[in-house]
């Protein structure tokens, strides 16, 4: 099960955070800082899976952004690793070459995409067309 989903830049600034288990608001900042430091401090030759406290971190770097997913110890790491890539491909498809600025200025749309893919910490959809369908409808409604 996915516990949290983060996108952080190379400076360690959180650009997107989504929690699927309750984490006290005061502890979230500390958790995000520790998690981003753990991922940012690793070289590109090191494994993208990290044992961290009572869960695993799976991360992938895309240009200046790191996508980090915290999961319980029973989750399949490779499945989550590919899920991260699928998420970024969906973002690329919608924003045509997604960037950090796209995420910052369209955070609501990024959350809609993530919510279409993950429900209560479980991956429920991976098909790009079905994920983007609600957003495309919203875009058409806002144009008219």
UniProtKB/Swiss-Prot annotation:
It comes from the Eukaryota. Keywords: Golgi apparatus, Membrane, Protein transport, Transport. It is a peripheral membrane protein. Pfam families: Clat_adaptor_s. Its main location: Golgi. GO terms for cellular component: AP-4 adaptor complex; trans-Golgi network. GO terms for biological process: intracellular protein transport; vesicle-mediated transport. It is found in: Golgi apparatus, trans-Golgi network membrane. CDD domains: AP4_sigma. Component of the adaptor protein complex 4 (AP-4). Adaptor protein complexes are vesicle coat components involved both in vesicle formation and cargo selection. They control the vesicular transport of proteins in different trafficking pathways. AP-4 forms a non clathrin-associated coat on vesicles departing the trans-Golgi network (TGN) and may be involved in the targeting of proteins from the trans-Golgi network (TGN) to the endosomal-lysosomal system. Adaptor protein complex 4 (AP-4) is a heterotetramer composed of two large adaptins (epsilon-type subunit AP4E1 and beta-type subunit AP4B1), a medium adaptin (mu-type subunit AP4M1) and a small adaptin (sigma-type AP4S1). Belongs to the adaptor complexes small subunit family. PANTHER family: ADAPTOR COMPLEXES SMALL SUBUNIT FAMILY (PTHR11753). This is AP-4 complex subunit sigma-1. It comes from Mus musculus.
């Amino acid at each position: 099960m996915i516990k949290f989903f983060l996108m952080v830049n190379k400076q360690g600034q959180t650009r997107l955070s989504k929690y699927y288990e309750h984490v006290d608001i005061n502890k979230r900042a500390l958790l995000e800082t520790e998690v981003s430091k753990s991922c940012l401090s690793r070289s590109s030759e090191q494994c993208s899976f990290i044992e961290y406290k009572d869960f695993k971190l799976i991360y992938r770097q895309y240009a200046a952004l790191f996508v980090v997913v915290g999961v319980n110890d029973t989750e399949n790491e490779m499945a989550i690793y590919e899920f991260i890539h699928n998420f970024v491909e969906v973002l690329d498809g919608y924003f045509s070459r997604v960037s950090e600025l796209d995420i910052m200025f369209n955070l609501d749309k990024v959350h809609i995409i993530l919510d279409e893919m993950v429900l209560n910490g479980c991956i429920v959809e991976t098909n790009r067309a079905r994920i983007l369908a609600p957003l495309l409808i919203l875009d058409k409604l806002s144009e008219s």
